């Protein structure tokens, strides 16, 4: 007798379906049970407003979480950068698989890199974080660009470049990789140029907190280094009281001595979207061995950033 299928709640977008499909295959291998994808439409998918206008935080996950709490699905897959930093009562992030490339990338006309864009180039992005850092980079390198707010899926965003409406768009490398379009990238942006969003490139697999057997099975997919890194990044975001649409970038990476991981470096940035002012700091310490240690690393760096005026650069802080 075939075991009952596990139901995986996912957004309907091509990217969400691709990443949910990868997780479904992994869960099926671990549990020996089939996994059925259950498509759910979220408010963030149907609204055409910019993320900053609709509140940003949680707009892509609320419907998935409601389905989990109602028992309509057994687990859900989120892009971690879309997940609110506060723990949701009754739910648990049972797995954070190994992270994909966290960098941002450029898809530009005529195969141009960021530094090769024509004077006055129109560069599309949906993220105030990217706008702040791209405009700051342009200011310090004698470039003239116009950052243009855009929404839409990968096809829509790249379509603006193909149609000539924009000279370039900036997207997450991980998303393009998951939908098989990484070969369209014309420039991989160094994290020294643009720090990614907290949790960018990582997935969160969430289920009911009282489903002990499923939590144990999903834990097989968890990558402890990725979890420590994104916990520190998201702790910084939470301590800044910033939502996922705020102009905040963060990246924790591991510093190795040969084959041995020695330390974790956490970098954070917050800035005005016109790029006129950035607060960018970093800290390095032992690799956090507990959830609390990772939280502390992010909180400490956030406190330093706030002491240097970060709060005044974010506009409206998350409520």
From Swiss-Prot:
Domain of life: Bacteria
Gene3D superfamilies per record: Periplasmic binding protein-like II (3.40.190.10), Porphobilinogen deaminase, C-terminal domain (3.30.160.40)
GO terms classed as biological process: heme biosynthetic process; protoporphyrinogen IX biosynthetic process
Cofactor(s), by name: dipyrromethane
Protein's pathway: Porphyrin-containing compound metabolism; protoporphyrin-IX biosynthesis; coproporphyrinogen-III from 5-aminolevulinate: step 2/4
Entry keyword GTP-binding: no
Keywords on record: Porphyrin biosynthesis, Transferase
Residue list for modification S-(dipyrrolylmethanemethyl)cysteine: 244
Binding note for cofactor: Binds 1 dipyrromethane group covalently.
Enzyme Commission identifier(s): 2.5.1.61
MF GO annotations: hydroxymethylbilane synthase activity
GO cellular component annotations of the record: cytoplasm
Reactions catalysed: 4 porphobilinogen + H2O = hydroxymethylbilane + 4 NH4(+)
Pfam families: Porphobil_deam, Porphobil_deamC
Xref: NCBIfam families: hemC
Miscellaneous information on this protein: The porphobilinogen subunits are added to the dipyrromethane group.
Family: Belongs to the HMBS family.
Complex formation: Monomer.
Functional description taken from the UniProt entry: Tetrapolymerization of the monopyrrole PBG into the hydroxymethylbilane pre-uroporphyrinogen in several discrete steps.
Protein name, UniProt field: Porphobilinogen deaminase 1
Organism: Streptomyces coelicolor (strain ATCC BAA-471 / A3(2) / M145)
């Amino acid at each position: 007798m075939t075991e009952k299928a596990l139901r995986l709640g996912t957004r309907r977008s091509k990217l969400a379906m691709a990443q949910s499909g990868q997780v479904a295959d992994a869960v099926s291998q671990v549990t020996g049970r089939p996994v059925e994808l259950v498509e759910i439409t979220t408010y963030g998918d149907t609204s055409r407003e910019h993320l900053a206008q609709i509140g940003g935080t949680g707009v892509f996950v609320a419907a998935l979480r409601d389905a989990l709490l109602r028992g309509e699905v057994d687990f859900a897959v989120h892009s971690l950068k879309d997940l609110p930093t506060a723990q949701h009562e009754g739910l648990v992030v049972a797995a954070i698989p190994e992270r994909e490339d966290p960098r941002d990338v450029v898809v530009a006309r005529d195969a141009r890199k960021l530094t090769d864009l024509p004077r006055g180039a129109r560069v599309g992005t949906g993220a105030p974080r990217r706008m702040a850092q791209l405009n700051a980079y342009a200011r310090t390198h004698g470039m003239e660009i116009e950052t243009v707010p855009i929404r839409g899926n990968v096809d829509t965003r790249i379509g603006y470049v193909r149609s000539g409406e924009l000279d370039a768009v900036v997207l997450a490398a991980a998303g393009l990789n998951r939908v098989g379009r990484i070969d369209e990238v014309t420039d991989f942006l160094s994290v020294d140029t643009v720090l990614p969003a907290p949790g960018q490139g990582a997935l969160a697999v969430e289920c009911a907190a009282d489903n002990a057997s499923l939590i144990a099975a999903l834990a097989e997919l968890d990558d402890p280094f990725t979890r420590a890194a994104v916990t520190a990044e998201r702790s910084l975001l939470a301590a800044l009281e910033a939502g996922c649409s705020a102009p905040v970038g963060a990246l924790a990476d591991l510093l190795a001595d040969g084959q041995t991981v020695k330390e974790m470096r956490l970098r954070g940035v917050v800035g005005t979207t016109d790029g006129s002012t950035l607060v960018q700091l970093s800290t390095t310490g032992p690799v956090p061995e507990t959830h609390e240690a990772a939280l502390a690393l992010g909180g400490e760096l956030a406190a330093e950033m706030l002491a240097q005026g970060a709060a005044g650069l974010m506009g409206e802080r998350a409520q």
